[in-house]
């Protein structure tokens, strides 16, 4: 980390949110209510105080130094270094593309032990300067990188997924979506999530699908300073936006495919999230394949395939489309199962390998 230049102060903590519309809130829930009420509603919701009992939250509410020392204590031998994104001061915490070609990013990556990362963040936090480099460790799985974290900070919502840590200073993460169900828990610092429903996709001006910063594609629009001349439809997206302001101990449930911009305020910020039901990621792969196989067909032919997609995929009764066949003959049109998933995978492999 010695190559990172001297630090600076965050000048952006007083910036106003993009909208006054707030995400719905409720108090902390137990596992039963989470499964039956929160997950099934398919709407974002703030769970106030959901993880206020965590040891890590107590450290985060204490001071930057207390938080840094708590994190460093998990840097035992055997813990893997973290993948850290490092951006120069002039990007003001916004990880994005470097220029109009969209071929390069405005940051680089470095493998850093947890102890070295928090020491650098603490040095930044305790130094009064103008504007810092931005450091951001993203999606570090606790079992691999911070062994012992999950035992000390249990979520208790019946989620079968590892805790993932996001550690940095004042960051701005471009509007993106996740293919999995997501619950994000703030440990230290303050987080602002700006969310857009899935149907706002056309108004978000999505960037490249196959050259992205961290997996999913991102909106090209900066919600903190939108260029409405270049991206006029984003004004419509803002009328549907919702904002969640989170303090340490709060959690936010985000349904899959909901777009969200994430902003962290402060000198040392820690968030823990959980993704599960990862199979939904296959839907994006199917979309990409459809772009190549269907999108550019002649209009009449494409309309014919639209009928197939509607009948077998999107119609309310699509799961019953093969009910006229005996169960033994339904094959990949049969009900969801591990066996069907394997058969579909093998069918696709066989088809894609043909000359």
Question: Can you say where each PLM-predicted feature lies in the sequence?
Answer:
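N-terminal accessory scaffold of Fe(II)-dependent oxygenases
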Residues: 1-10, 15-251, 259-355
């Amino acid at each position: 980390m010695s190559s990172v230049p001297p630090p600076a102060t965050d000048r952006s903590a007083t910036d106003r949110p993009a909208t006054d519309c707030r995400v719905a809130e409720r108090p902390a829930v137990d596992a039963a209510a989470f499964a039956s009420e929160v997950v099934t509603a398919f709407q974002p919701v703030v769970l106030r105080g959901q993880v206020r009992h965590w040891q890590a939250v107590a450290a985060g509410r204490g001071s930057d130094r207390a938080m840094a020392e708590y994190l460093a204590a998990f840097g035992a031998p055997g813990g893997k270094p973290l993948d850290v994104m490092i951006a120069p001061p002039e990007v003001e915490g916004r990880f994005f593309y470097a220029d109009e070609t969209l071929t390069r990013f405005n940051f680089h990556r470095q493998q850093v032990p947890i102890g070295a990362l928090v020491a650098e963040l603490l040095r930044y936090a305790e130094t009064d300067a103008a504007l810092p480099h931005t450091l951001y460790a993203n999606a570090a799985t606790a079992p691999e990188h911070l062994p012992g974290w999950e035992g000390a900070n249990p979520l208790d919502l019946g989620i079968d997924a590892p805790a993932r840590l996001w550690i940095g200073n004042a960051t701005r993460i471009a509007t993106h979506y996740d293919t999995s169900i997501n619950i994000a828990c703030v440990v230290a610092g303050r987080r602002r999530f700006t969310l857009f429903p899935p149907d706002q996709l056309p108004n978000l001006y999505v960037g490249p699908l196959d050259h992205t910063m961290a997996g999913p594609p991102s909106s090209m629009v900066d919600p903190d300073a939108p260029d409405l001349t270049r991206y006029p439809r984003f004004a419509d997206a803002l009328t549907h936006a919702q904002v969640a302001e989170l303090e340490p101990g709060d959690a936010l449930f985000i349904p899959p495919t909901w777009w969200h911009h994430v902003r962290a305020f402060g000198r040392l910020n820690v968030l823990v999230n959980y993704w599960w039901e990862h199979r939904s990621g296959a839907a994006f792969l199917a979309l990409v394949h459809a772009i190549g196989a269907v999108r550019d067909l002649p209009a009449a032919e494409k309309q014919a395939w639209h009928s197939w997609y509607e009948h077998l995929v999107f119609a309310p009764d699509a799961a019953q489309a093969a009910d006229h066949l005996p169960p033994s003959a339904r094959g990949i049109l049969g009900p969801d199962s591990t066996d069907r998933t394997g058969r579909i995978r093998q069918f696709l492999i066989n088809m894609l390998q043909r000359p």
